[in-house]
Design a protein with these regions (language model features):
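Structured soluble/peripheral alpha/beta segments that form catalytic or ligand/cofactor-binding pockets
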Residues: 1-168
Length: 168
């Protein structure tokens, strides 16, 4: 995977009548750091939004994690726009429940080899609040909140652009 994927955010949540699975994947340098959003939103078990081309991703309040050195967002937001309807799914981090440097448990020789080839992997798992809000003609018509768990995985070295992720 590390030859293709530089990093990703991945989340799944059930909120009121909604279920969402959302991910933003960034490719490695070999693929121009292209991004891909994978997104699904269902209401009462029926998929209502799954056209990735209609989804934007943004982060807010990004800071460098003290243990892993990776940029971590307090807020990740997926916005789905379709004609007059807009769905905004926001994950707001309250607790980081896991921070792992992927080589820290490896034998010394393997850690050295990983550094030499540029492997700088880290994994983060978060808990916090998820909010799903539906807008019709820019007026909020539904809003649900609940608890969620999501993750951030890094295979590659941190780039300066990672600290200010936004995707139109």
């Amino acid at each position: 995977m590390q030859t293709i994927i530089h990093n990703w955010y991945w989340a799944r949540a059930s909120v009121g009548p909604y279920t969402t699975i959302a991910s933003r994947i960034t490719a490695t340098a070999a693929y121009g750091y292209e991004t891909q959003i994978v997104y699904m939103l269902a209401r009462d078990g029926q998929i209502i939004a799954d056209d990735d081309a209609k989804v934007s991703f943004e982060t807010d309040r990004v800071a460098i994690d003290g243990k892993t050195g990776k940029p971590v967002a307090d807020v990740t937001r997926y916005t789905y726009r379709d004609t007059d309807a807009r769905y905004v799914v926001s994950f707001e981090r309250e607790t980081t429940i896991l921070q792992a440097i992927l080589t820290e448990r490896a034998p010394l020789l393997k850690r050295i080899m990983a550094r030499l080839i540029g492997f700088d992997g880290a994994y983060h798992r978060f808990t916090g609040k998820v909010t799903i809000e539906k807008f019709e003609r820019d007026v909020s018509v539904e809003r649900f909140e609940d608890r969620a768990i999501w993750e951030l995985m890094y295979f590659g070295k941190t780039r300066s652009q990672d600290a200010k992720i936004q995707n139109p």
